[in-house]
Structure formats: structure tokens, C-alpha cells
Amino acid sequence: MAPAVKAGMKRRHVEDVEPAEDFTNVYGSHYATQDMPCDDIPDDSMPPEVAYRMIKDELSLDNNPKLNLASFVSTYMEKEAEDLMLEAMSKNFIDFEEYPQTAEIHHRCANMIANLFHAPKDIGIGSSSVGSSEAIMLAVLAMKRRWKQQRQQQGKPADNPNIVMSSAVQVCWEKAARYFEIEEKYVNCTRTRFVIDPKEAVELCDENTIGIVAILGTTYTGAYEDVKAISDLLVEKKSDVPIHVDAASGGFVAPFVVPDLEWDFRVERVVSINVSGHKYGLVYPGVGWVVWRSSEYLPKDLIFNINYLGAEQTSFTLNFSKGASQVIGQYYQLIRLGKAGYRHIMCNLTKTADYLTDELRKLGFVIMSEGHGKSLPLVAFRFAGKEEGETEEKEFDEFALAHYLRSRGWVIPAYTMAPETGQMKMMRIVVREDFSRSRCELLIKDIKLCSQLLEKDSEQLIMRLKQHIGQHTSGSGKIRDPMGAAKAVFKNESHSLQGKTGKSHAVC
């Protein structure tokens, strides 16, 4: 029973209570009862603790990065590395005159990575980028320009360049070809081969081919494509077509786990390599690196000599201003860990991936990744089908399992494989530095649980959960998406591999 109101006292309603402007608790201020600014910059300022708390609360709805096993991107660095990067946040990397030691650290990183990839001593050249996508754009530009110059010197037309690559390439390769007007020639995967076929790749080459792309760690299954076999066939044919190695994921794995594997500048026809520092280079995003065998493969007319803020500098980038933090973070990891540290970490990740592979195989999944150091530390798998002797068709697929795992907090993607694989569906778990054996055990239990739930649940229930999670991951729907109009217009595009074949653009 509610207490009676004393005589002379006024009953106060919620609407009558005005939030105190000087209230020390964020949630006692009027900001807690208002929507966050969405379209227009607010007229008035707000206290820093309020802005911080409101944004932090919104970000808590994001997935936990440690449970995001879709991405190769690093989610752990030591506090000392984080402190160095925080202290350098205000430095603009491009200001060489003002920050000469930062430039020196960049050069050290580029040299270390070039030497790791066995670039010829003192003539290999390299540069940082904001990630492998920019590095790939730069490498493609260099290959195209060099091919064009050779054609012009021979008095031949140079208006129809093409590039040969596997249909399992990451979408940035499609972008590079499209943006720079280069014809894409694909070597399609099959249901039993998920990498490029060296012989077919070389046969696709003609006088207009600017280069062949070989992937050291494919996006889907983590497989290492046979760079040396491609090179040997080119040499045998006396073809001068160069090879670029996309080592975005594998460039910091293979040298430490399988050091005898020849994929880098030890291979005759390899002229350039890209690698992501923010993947198995163990740095927070975003930093990448691109290295050329020598200046011969980087045409001079792509290089800009700039006098910027009083300093002469050589530039070959798509970006200009960028933070110095990631380069400093990369240098910390290289000298802190050394080759021994990287070797221990990469071998541990490989062991964890192999253990996870064995456990998933016991649960009846078909394993698509090679493992045992012969590929990236990831596990690619799918449900068994008719090819494996299954007689009954399941009411659910890999996408349904991915949605059920999302309800447990795990972000594990499902994909439709590359063209010519019969719309094969698969899932991929990336084993990163902070994915311990104990966390691996918890994941295995949840995969087993979700698989059992899928067996019991109806098709309608599975579909409702998919729709629910799809709406949750696409945001509240209240805010106008600046790219919304473009999405509506280009939703059914048919110029990409995804639009043409249904292949999923995999998370990198």
C-alpha cells in the first residue's frame, strides 16, 4: 500500500522533475533523455564525460572483437605498444621534416620486411600503406605502367591490358582492375581445387597481360598458391609476364612456419609483394606494406619528388596525410618479438588451428583447409553433403549455423565459394594471436550446441532468427544511411564476381 501524502506536500510527477545541469552523474543530466545527434552538428557543446559515456554506451552494442573470428585483423597488442602508438597519434606521418625519426623508423620497417622476403640486397624498395588494398593498388599501377611503357617502346598498342588471377581473390583485386581499366582473366576454382591452377594461369597470358597474381593464403581456405610452379612455367615458355604475390595474410606466417617454402623474391618471376601489418604482422589496423624486387619494376613517372614543409621526399602513395602510430606499432612488434617471437606465435596458432580442425572433424564437418603449416592458421569447413554419403538433405545450411553462433556472441562467417564450385557453402574460423586453447574449447562446445539446436528447430524458427539477427546487425533503421541511395540503385549489380556468380566477398 502506497504511503499517504502528508498535508501541505505536493505530489510530484516525473514530468515535473528537471534534470540538474550540474549533476555529476551522466545519467542524471538532460542528455540521458535525448537522442544522440545524428544528422546535424548540435548547436551547443556537451561536457566531455557525457560525450564519452554516451558514445561508449552505443559502442557496447558492437560485437566483442575477441569473439570476431571472421577477421584476420589484429585485436591484441601489448600495453607498451599501445602507449607508443597513443603518444604518436598526433603525428602526421608524411611530415618527414618535422618527424625525421618517425621517417627513419618507417625505413627500418620497410628494409626488415624486404629482407624477410629475400629481396636483393640494397636494391629492393618498399613503402608503407594504410593496408593491403592500397598496397595492391600501387603494385597494379606499377605493373600496368611498366607494361604500357614496354608496348609503346615496341610501337604496339597499349589500350587493352589484362591481369590473370584466381577467382578466389579478395574483392580489392576486382576493384583495382575495374578502377584502372584492366581486363580480369580468372582461373576458376573447382569443388576440389580452391587455388589457382598454375598451368591454366600461364595459358591465359598473352601479350597484353600485365601480370599474374598468386595468393599466399587465400581468403576462403587459407591455402598457399604455388608461386614457384607459376614462375617455372613462365620461364619454360620464355614469357616475361611478372608475378605479384598477394601475401596480405601469409606474409608474416609462411616465413616462420614453413621457411623453406619458396614464394617470395627467391622465385625468379616475382617482382612485387604486398603484406598486411595489421593481420599476422600483429599491429592494430591499418598498416600494410608493398615491396618491389628493385626500382626497375617501379616506373619513375609514378614517383613524385615533393618539397613538403621544407623537406625533399619521394612519394608513391594513393594517400598523403596519415597517422604515424601504426608504423611505430609495426616497428615495436618487429624488434620486440624478433624472428623467434613471431615463430613461436605463428606455430602456436597453427597448433590451435590443427586442434580445432580435429575437433570439428569429429563433429562430422568436412574440412576444406589444409592445415599443419601448409596454409594459414584458419579452419574452413562445411556440412557433409551427398558427396560424403549423406542421404537426407538438411533443413538448414552453414548460414543458419553462423546465425545461431551469433546468438552466442561468436562472429563466424558463412560464405558462398568462388565460381565453378556449384554454389558450395562454407564457414571459416580465423585463429588469431589472442585465440587461446581455452577459448577454442568454448567455441567447440557452442558449435556442438548450435548444431544440435538446428537439428531440433523448425525451418520457420531458423528463418525468424536469421531475420532478427540481420535487422540487429544492420543498425536501428532510424538513421539515414549516407550510402543508402547507392545501395538501392546498385543492389543488383552484375559487374563483380559476387554479382555474376553469387560468390561471397569474404571478410579480410
Predicted feature locations:
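Non-catalytic terminal extensions of PLP-dependent enzymes
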Residues: 1-111, 115-120, 141, 147, ...
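Conserved PLP-enzyme active-site core in the AAT-like
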Residues: 13, 17-24, 130-304, 309-312, ...
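A short glycine/serine-rich beta->alpha loop
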Residues: 37, 70-73, 93-97, 122-130, ...
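Glycine- and acidic
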Residues: 90-97, 120-127, 158-160, 184-189, ...
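Secondary-structure capping and boundary motifs in well-ordered enzyme cores
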Residues: 101, 128-135, 165, 169, ...
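Structured alpha-helical segments in the cores of large, soluble enzyme domains
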Residues: 106-113, 169-174, 197-205, 319-326, ...
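Hydrophobic alpha-helix feature that most strongly marks membrane-spanning transmembrane helices
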Residues: 209, 213-214, 235, 253, ...
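Active-site C-terminal subdomain of aminotransferase-like
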Residues: 244, 256-377, 381-390, 394
